Swiss-Prot record:
Disulfide bonds: none annotated. Belongs to the UPF0434 family. InterPro entries: Trm112-like. One of its GO terms (cellular component) is cytosol. It comes from Serratia proteamaculans (strain 568). It comes from the Bacteria. This is UPF0434 protein Spro_1718. The lineage of its organism: Bacteria, Pseudomonadati, Pseudomonadota, Gammaproteobacteria, Enterobacterales.
């Protein structure tokens, strides 16, 4: 994931900062508890495509 892209993308729900989870290849919004997938290296920033974080993931 290009760090320059991380500087400009935002959560589509709350417009907050997204963090890259390298292990799961996801962009994570800790505020909303959502993880957005990457497909072929492209972030899919659609709320209906996001995965809800588990309680453990939210507090990690």
């Amino acid at each position: 994931m290009d760090h320059r892209l991380l500087e400009i993308v935002a959560c589509p729900v709350c417009t907050g900062k997204l963090y890259f989870n390298k292990e799961n290849q996801e962009l994570v919004c800790k505020v909303d508890g959502l993880a957005y997938p990457l497909r072929d290296g492209i972030p899919v920033l659609l709320e209906n495509e996001a995965r809800a974080l588990s309680l453990d993931e939210k507090h990690a």
